[in-house]
UniProtKB/Swiss-Prot annotation:
Peptidase M12B domain boundaries: 205-400
Source organism: Naja mossambica (Mozambique spitting cobra)
The entry's keywords: Calcium, Cell adhesion impairing toxin, Disulfide bond, Glycoprotein, Hemostasis impairing toxin, Hydrolase, Metal-binding, Metalloprotease, Platelet aggregation inhibiting toxin, Protease, Secreted, Signal, Toxin, Zinc, Zymogen
InterPro entries: ADAM_Cys-rich, Disintegrin_CS, Disintegrin_dom, Disintegrin_dom_sf, MetalloPept_cat_dom_sf, Peptidase_M12B, Peptidase_M12B_N, Reprolysin_adamalysin
Binding site for Ca(2+) 2: 410, 413, 415, 417, 420, 423
Similarity remark: Belongs to the venom metalloproteinase (M12B) family. P-III subfamily. P-IIIa sub-subfamily.
Protein name from the UniProt record: Snake venom metalloproteinase-disintegrin-like mocarhagin
Length: 609
């Protein structure tokens, strides 16, 4: 008993080395076991500072050893990780959209640094122990809890000690760039900038970031929503740190999990997937949830060794401010680097060339991904700067939440902060006649300075259209006469006839078999004759209603138009089966589709409206 106690005491005080272990981030062949000790935060008078009643503290300190030397890790909660209007969306088995909007305040995601080290940084989640990475004496170390009986044991290791999951390095899928040679980029002289350009460059910028997790990734983590959300939070927390040096703040405004099947055809052709995701963002996502940039996370393997793709210089574009990223590693840090790389393309950066350098040996925009990447190269910084001055994207000047402000508000920095009614820049630059640039207050008798329902500094009259109806199932939105904002999008009730009685409204759309055939096969494709749909009742055909545990379930006779979608194309068979796909919903009749008189498809059954 005494001997066991002495061993436990030694382990708590002196770290020990390990040769090989399987951790959450992968197989590690050399690591150090440490026991981080929490250090109470003291005020100047030596009295412990009281903090509000929360599960996770705003600031924390931990002491442990690295290579035998003591270090103190300072952590500060990333209060701006979530936008004030952050939402989470997933889908019920019957296709219903389920969105929750409770604010995430008491979370466990931190940024930090090592005490007494100028060039130090840390990205840590403290949900169950300490997990993440920190920079110490110029090297990147990773830390995560060990699954031992002693819950305080942690492993510390370097990225070179993580065994590669595959021999082939992961690369970016971008092949077209905006540079023409491999010559080093010459820095533009600051003297060529106007004062207005300098103020724009220096203004803090914000990206309201929306993440979509596809159905393949959802199933990879066996449908455990809490596991997926925590994984995404860790990635975005790391992403935030990487963009701090560019004066950008990434705020997560929404997380959507396609739990009931993919909303687009996610395929191994990464360019096709990117194009479809961009169209989905423009046509489906933006009408219901504003965001500046969106990324699709998928566990689908793209062709070759590609792990992601993003449009170059496209931020704020409704269709092209997007990227797709493969969840290609157990390590959230590794996937976060891929996310940062693809977002870099949206922000005007190309893949680095041989002449590009950064403080570390490997830069974020390198064509190959490494776990210790944390800096943008000189090329990336210059390309990004030139893109900002050339395109002047405006969506990044809108701060996601007034309540999230940590620093005092600054009048004249182009975004409205606590206590301000407007902000149009400095008095010299302001071109908004509704706003007093000196005070950041509205001019006398002005009611507003911007918004869909603001015109000549006054609210538009009640009844003025501010958003046109998109289709038969959408209502036009009208100004109230009391606000500059356009009211939230509203839809016709589900079940209302649409498109000359070809369909019934469903969540703001009018799904019909003909439209779905055109989407699947291209213009000119039409719904097959009703006889073809009887194949969904025939065990020997490609028809079915759904699959359960890999077993094909046929439709009942009354439900045949709610199973497999059959279309006819020019010069083709009349009963044309969709091509095979790993996505269980690909080529299936969409929920809400008309399947009879006053009947629609719901959960693969034809039911009354």
């Amino acid at each position: 008993m005494i001997q066991a106690l002495l061993v436990a005491i030694c382990l708590a005080v002196f770290p020990y080395q390990g040769s090989s272990i399987i951790l959450e981030s992968g197989n590690v062949n050399d690591y150090e076991v440490v026991y981080p000790q929490k250090v109470p935060a003291l005020s100047k008078g030596g009295v412990q500072n009281p903090q509000p009643e929360t599960k996770y503290e705003d600031t924390m300190q931990y002491e442990f050893h690295v290579n035998g030397e003591p270090v103190v890790l300072h952590l500060e909660r990333n209060k701006g990780l979530f936008s004030e209007d952050y939402t989470e969306t997933h889908y019920a088995p019957d296709g219903r959209e389920i969105t929750t909007s409770s604010p995430v305040q008491d979370h466990c995601y931190y940024h930090g640094y090592i005490q007494n080290e100028a060039d130090s940084s840390a990205v840590i989640s403290a949900c169950d122990g300490l997990k993440g990475h920190f920079k110490h004496q110029g090297e990147t170390y990773f830390i995560e809890p060990l699954e031992l009986s002693d819950s305080e044991a942690h492993a510390i290791y370097k990225d070179e000690n993580v065994e590669e999951e595959e021999e082939i390095p992961k690369i970016c899928g971008v092949t077209q760039t905006t540079w023409e040679s491999d010559e080093p980029i010459e820095k533009s002289s600051q003297l060529t900038n106007t004062p207005e350009q300098d103020r724009y460059l220096q203004a803090k910028k914000y990206i309201e970031f929306y993440v979509v997790v596809d159905n393949v990734m959802y199933r990879k983590y066996t449908g455990k929503l809490h596991v997926i959300t925590r994984r995404v939070y860790e990635m975005v927390n790391a992403l935030n740190t990487m963009y701090r040096r560019l004066n950008f703040h990434i705020a997560l405004i929404g997380l959507e999990i396609w739990s009931n099947g993919n909303e687009i055809n996610v395929q191994s052709d990464v360019q096709a997937t990117l194009d479809l995701f961009g169209e989905w963002r423009e046509n489906k996502l933006l009408p219901r949830k504003r965001n500046d940039n969106a990324q699709l996370l998928t566990s689908t393997e793209f062709n070759g060794t590609t792990t992601g793709l993003g449009y170059i210089g496209s931020l704020c574009s409704p269709k092209k401010s997007v990227a797709v990223v493969q969840d290609h590693s157990k390590s959230t840090s590794m996937v976060a680097i891929t996310m940062a790389h693809q977002m870099g393309h949206n922000l005007g950066m190309n893949d680095d060339r041989a002449s590009c350098t950064c403080g570390s040996n490997k830069c974020i925009m390198s064509t190959k991904y490494y776990e210790s990447l944390s800096e943008f190269s000189s090329c990336s910084v210059q390309e990004h700067r030139e893109y900002l001055l050339r395109d002047r994207p405006q969506c990044i000047l809108n701060k996601p939440s007034r309540k999230a402000i940590v620093t005092p508000p600054v009048c004249g920095n182009y975004f409205v902060e606590r206590g301000e009614e407007c902000d149009c820049g400095s008095p010299e630059d302001c071109q908004n006649t509704c706003c007093d640039a000196a005070t950041c207050k509205l001019q006398h008798e002005a009611q507003c300075d911007s918004g869909e329902c603001c015109e000549k500094c006054k609210f538009k009259g009640a009844g003025a259209e501010c958003r046109a109806a998109k289709n038969d199932c959408d209502f036009p939105e009208l100004c109230t006469g009391r606000s500059a904002k356009c009211p939230k999008d509203s839809f016709q009730r589900n079940g209302h006839p649409c498109q000359n009685n070809q369909g019934y409204c469903y969540n703001g759309t009018c799904p019909t078999l003909t439209n779905q055939c055109a989407t699947l096969w291209g213009p000119g494709a039409k719904m097959s004759p009703g006889l073809c749909f009887m194949l969904n009742w025939n065990a020997r055909s490609c028809g079915l209603c759904r699959k359960e545990n890999g077993r094909k379930i046929l439709c009942a006779a009354k439900d045949v138009k709610c199973g497999r979608l059959f279309c006819k194309k020019k010069n083709s068979m009349i009963c044309h089966c969709p091509p095979p796909s790993k996505d269980p919903n690909y080529g299936m009749v969409a929920p809400g589709t008309k399947c009879g008189v006053k009947k629609v498809c719901r959960n693969r059954q034809c039911v009354k409206v």
